[in-house]
């Protein structure tokens, strides 16, 4: 099943999940009762902006401004939202 991500959607971290910088890993991670996920590349930059207030469009716009030279960034951001939703890391507000 494909997940449709709209620019007007707003997301938050799923219940019982916590996002943080893990000094030992030198990376952003998502902690949840079953374990931990280490976020690679720009994934941490996307999740860092998921605050139950910003729309997907606002997150995309902010990341495009922050990383203007990143090719195909919008598609990668939407892909990150799709993956995070399919894994149960995010919930729609």
Model-derived segments and spans:
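Acidic, low-complexity/disordered tracts enriched in E/D and polar residues
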Residues: 1-48, 93
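Long, charge-rich, low-complexity alpha-helical segments
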Residues: 35-93
């Amino acid at each position: 099943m494909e997940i449709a991500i709209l620019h007007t959607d707003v997301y938050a971290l799923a219940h019982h999940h916590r996002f943080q910088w893990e000094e030992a890993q030198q990376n952003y991670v998502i902690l949840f009762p079953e374990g931990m996920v280490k976020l690679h590349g720009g994934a941490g930059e996307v999740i860092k902006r998921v605050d139950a207030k910003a729309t997907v469009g606002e997150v995309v716009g902010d990341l495009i401004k922050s990383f203007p030279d990143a090719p195909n960034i919008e598609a990668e951001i939407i892909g990150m939202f799709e993956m995070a939703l399919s894994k149960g890391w995010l919930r729609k507000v």
